[in-house]
């Protein structure tokens, strides 16, 4: 499939698709979800290459960085580190991650939207979630569950670092 066709079907710009292909900082999870939907593959296809039909166990001592994303679609710095908790699980529909949100003093960010649902549980720090016209501040132990088709953005409250558990469901 040509890059222009992929971009159009995924409702992305050609520049966004080229940035993803170039192995530079990824602009966020939403563009990958949109591309996966267009290609008819699961999101995990882009994140890991080993497949297991049975149970997949993630051990704390084995935690490793899966992928880094920028919280700002137009900028190149990365401030979200995703640790996959389902790496290698074949045919999964849920994508559980522990996400380290790094300090970021840039107040500008782009809201994202994609099909599916998200559940977020705050493990450490505080996060601010813009969801539609609402803003929620969550502290350690708080959680939120929402439809991700509504425009949303997750970041550290007042630019501070935080750590969350995020479970993302994306229909294929």
What positions do the PLM features span?
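Residue-level signal for the short linker/turn that defines the boundary of a DNA-recognition helix
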Residues: 1, 12, 27-30, 136
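Short alpha-helical DNA-recognition segment
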Residues: 1-19
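Conserved short histidine dyad/triad with adjacent acidic residue
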Residues: 62-72, 78-88, 96-114, 148-151
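Glycine- and acidic-residue-biased ligand/ion/polar-headgroup-sensing regions
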Residues: 114-132
